[in-house]
């Protein structure tokens, strides 16, 4: 972003306005992670001159068809994509699974390839892998400018276009992304900008991605999220209580460091800490998904914004993220966990959690109204959640 002008040896892209909005809306989150000024990023980007060899915008031509009982799930083996797969399987969408490989993610592909082999043996579904070589263009270390968050917030938009040929090969009507309810959470940064930690996964933006895939496929391929009505903790509960055969494959960690070289959970990051907390809150054995170390010890306080931790994902800085931790620690306490951070929670926050218990229960276990789910599948999906959330609150939530 230091260059005054960029010349592309291509036509002007059809989706230039989409990527422009996606990028602009992601800047505040990038700035927070990179510890730079949002205003500086916006100014440099807006002042950058972009030219194309040919200004004509070419429209796509597509003559394929799609089947209403076929889908492709963008599967990362995180809880969201695993639940998406399980729900699509239950409602008869015959899900195929695909994974976009980021070359700069050090150990992620190795672990997911191993999981995919086991997954295929158990469920008979092959994981289609696509290497996203252009992803190196946002790898700051590879480019020699240092680690940066810039560009990573375009992933969902990019992946939808990358996976279109996969959808075509299976005549899939639906391209399914694991964008749950809290993806719309946001906060105001220090400069007064609205900051979305995951704008490309928000429901409003998923509608725009859907418009892109519909345009590219002649209205044949829809981009949807079947878990949009659920908060994180509800996603975890439904996955591990209704679909334990699928849930045991969970890998939510990015394994970005040497700690994740030989195991699918690095056990030294805020994501591992959060998943461990949610699992304990729901009364599930962490060993079931390979979380072999207690992440609720005092030395892991830095991973929880509730205790003032700074080594956290930007989502944890939202009021929703803070309340999620409050409620999850409360449930872990009620489930009899006596870890150091649970004890600290009882001293500092137990009274607040008790006073807000009904509010928090409703917030995190209600079914939120979806806007990305087509009517023809919405009823079947919501009936599953009504049944399972009622059972969860009766049997698993103390």
How should each PLM-predicted stretch be described?
Residues 1-60:
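Low-complexity, highly charged intrinsically disordered N-terminal segments
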Residues 80:
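Hydrophobic/small residue at the entry helix of a nucleotide-binding pocket
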Residues 38-71, 83-398:
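Nucleotide-activated chemistry modules centered on ATP-dependent adenylation/adenylyltransferase
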Residues 74-75:
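Edge beta-strand plus adjacent loop/short-helix module at the start
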């Amino acid at each position: 972003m230091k260059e005054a002008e960029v010349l592309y040896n291509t036509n002007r892209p059809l989706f230039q306005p989409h990527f422009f909005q996606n990028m602009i809306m992601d800047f505040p989150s990038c700035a927070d992670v990179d510890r730079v000024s949002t205003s500086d990023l916006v100014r440099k980007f807006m002042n950058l001159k972009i030219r194309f060899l040919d200004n004509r915008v070419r429209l796509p031509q597509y003559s394929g068809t799609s089947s209403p009982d076929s889908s492709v799930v963008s599967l990362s083996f995180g809880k969201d994509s695993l639940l998406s797969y399980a729900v699509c399987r239950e409602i008869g969408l015959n899900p195929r699974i695909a994974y976009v490989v980021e070359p700069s993610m050090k150990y992620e592909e190795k672990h997911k390839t191993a999981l995919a082999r086991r997954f295929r043996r158990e469920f008979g579904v092959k994981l289609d892998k696509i290497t996203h070589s252009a992803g190196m263009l946002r790898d700051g270390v590879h480019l020699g400018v240092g680690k940066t968050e810039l560009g990573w917030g375009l992933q969902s938009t990019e992946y939808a276009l990358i996976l279109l040929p996969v959808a075509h090969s299976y005549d899939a009507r639906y391209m399914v992304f694991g964008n749950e309810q809290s993806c719309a959470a946001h906060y105001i940064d220090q400069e007064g900008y609205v900051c979305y930690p995951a704008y490309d996964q928000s429901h409003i933006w998923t509608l725009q991605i859907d418009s892109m895939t519909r345009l590219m496929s002649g209205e044949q391929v829809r981009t949807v999220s079947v878990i949009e009505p659920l908060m994180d903790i509800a996603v975890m509960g439904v996955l591990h209580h209704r679909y334990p055969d699928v849930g045991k494959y969970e890998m939510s960690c990015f394994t970005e460091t040497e700690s994740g070289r030989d195991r699918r959970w690095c056990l030294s990051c805020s994501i591992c800490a959060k998943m461990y907390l949610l699992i304990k809150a729901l009364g599930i054995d962490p060993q079931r998904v390979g979380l072999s170390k207690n992440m609720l010890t005092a030395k892991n306080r830095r991973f929880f914004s509730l205790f003032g931790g700074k080594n956290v994902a930007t989502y944890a800085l939202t009021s929703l993220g803070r309340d999620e931790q409050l409620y999850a620690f409360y449930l872990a306490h009620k489930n009899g966990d006596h870890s150091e951070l649970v004890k600290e929670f009882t001293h500092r926050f137990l009274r607040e959690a008790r006073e807000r218990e009904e509010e928090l229960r409703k917030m995190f276990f209600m079914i939120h109204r979806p806007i990305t789910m087509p009517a023809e599948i919405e009823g079947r999906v919501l009936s599953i959640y009504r049944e399972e959330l009622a059972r969860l609150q009766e049997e698993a939530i103390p």
